[in-house]
Amino acid sequence: MGAMAQNPPNLRPDLAPRLVIDSPRREGQPTIGMVSLGCPKALVDSERILTRLRAEGYAISPDYAGADAVIVNTCGFLDSAKVESLEAIGEALRENGRVIVTGCLGAEPDYITGAHPKVLAVTGPHQYEQVLDAVHGAVPPAPDPFVDLLPATGVRLTPRHFSYLKISEGCNHTCRFCIIPDMRGRLASRPERAVLREAEKLVEAGVRELLVISQDTSAYGTDWKGPEKFPILPLARELGRLGAWVRLHYVYPYPHVRELIPLMAEGLVLPYLDIPFQHAHPEVLKRMARPAAAARTLDEIAAWRRDCPEIALRSTFIVGYPGETEAEFQTLLDWLDEAQLDRVGCFQYENVAGARSNALPDHVAPEVKQERWDRFMEKAQAISEVKLAAKVGRRIEVIVDEVDEDGATCRTKADAPEIDGNLFIDEGFRGLAPGDILTVEVEEAGEYDIWGRPV
């Protein structure tokens, strides 16, 4: 019986790793395994499920052999993600035999049971109670759970020094290529008090970096219809006062995003914006049902940089969207030249079951999509290389992620875990530990990573 795989599925540039977790157990204690696939938002769902199970006295197994049953939290955003999820379910069935499926792909139970009829149960995304009911049916809880085994912060699947902080569920946008609103529903923001309470507990437990996530972070709180027009602003300000790094992900490019920039200039929030622009040509954006103001976006980027010169901008793009012409793609390349984004991810368009974009005319041939992806990433890499070379000789603050006998792997304020680059320390790293924050002088730069020494 093998250990559960921990390698990233590598389906999209912004996917979280495939993770498992271990916990102490006592003889006869009911034990559950967890395989978590997909984005950081799914990772938070896995953490919540495991926290509830630990509170009920379940132990968590890092391998199939030690588990009484295995939960597979799936991704179903792209067809390739669905294939990866089915493979993970099949592996869990072969190695353990008792499998409960949850997550985004769980919204298509017939698809799962058609491929794997022996799964014990299938539940959809963030259906925590249904998952727990399925676990109780498969592996009854111990009569006297040891609640004191549960850490104050709950079960977490990230390293101890950083944590994802989910502030809302769902999305109100109707992008033609996306089925997330169908899977996760409309926007439902968590109360600010609940978010801050969770963040405070995390920081008290030693978390040095909070990664704020949702489907649409800049829309946080707009579903309340209250007097505050931009509720993410006071939330970000309060999070920034906790003393940890605060990094904002999935910020939709609304005009009022500019109000966040002063918080970055003041140092309350990291000077980093993860904004999914998706494309730059107005006609492509219109076919995507996205805002089509590329020129205004460039003006906004210039204003952000004027108000906070240290800001790092990350974005993701789709190439080969149905109907995309060579001229439209060239507009995207030209826009990227002007925007000079710091970090860029890109994937080739593919149909997703249930997406309205499937019915659009003039789908782009696979070889053309690949060729455009290659050209796009070549330009993005060249921009990254120049930007990183400009950091050589500068002193910057970094957070340590890992330390081994060869050195320390760190990140700058411009780099989120898993999706961005690293700063490596090859000398003078003895005594460093994950979560340490220190100043480093940059000595060398590559295409996506930099090297430095402590000062």
Swiss-Prot record:
It is found in: Cytoplasm. Residues 157-386 form the Radical SAM core domain. Its cofactor is [4Fe-4S] cluster. [4Fe-4S] cluster 2 binds at residues 171, 175, 178. One of its GO terms (biological process) is tRNA modification. The keyword Transferase applies. Residues 389-455 form the TRAM domain. Keywords: 4Fe-4S, Cytoplasm, Iron, Iron-sulfur, Metal-binding, S-adenosyl-L-methionine, Transferase. Its EC number is 2.8.4.4. Binds 2 [4Fe-4S] clusters. One cluster is coordinated with 3 cysteines and an exchangeable S-adenosyl-L-methionine. GO terms for molecular function: 4 iron, 4 sulfur cluster binding; aspartic acid methylthiotransferase activity; metal ion binding; protein methylthiotransferase activity. It holds the Pfam family TRAM_2. It catalyses: L-aspartate(89)-[ribosomal protein uS12]-hydrogen + (sulfur carrier)-SH + AH2 + 2 S-adenosyl-L-methionine = 3-methylsulfanyl-L-aspartate(89)-[ribosomal protein uS12]-hydrogen + (sulfur carrier)-H + 5'-deoxyadenosine + L-methionine + A + S-adenosyl-L-homocysteine + 2 H(+). The keyword Electron transport does not apply. Belongs to the methylthiotransferase family. RimO subfamily. Catalyzes the methylthiolation of an aspartic acid residue of ribosomal protein uS12. This is Ribosomal protein uS12 methylthiotransferase RimO. The gene is rimO.
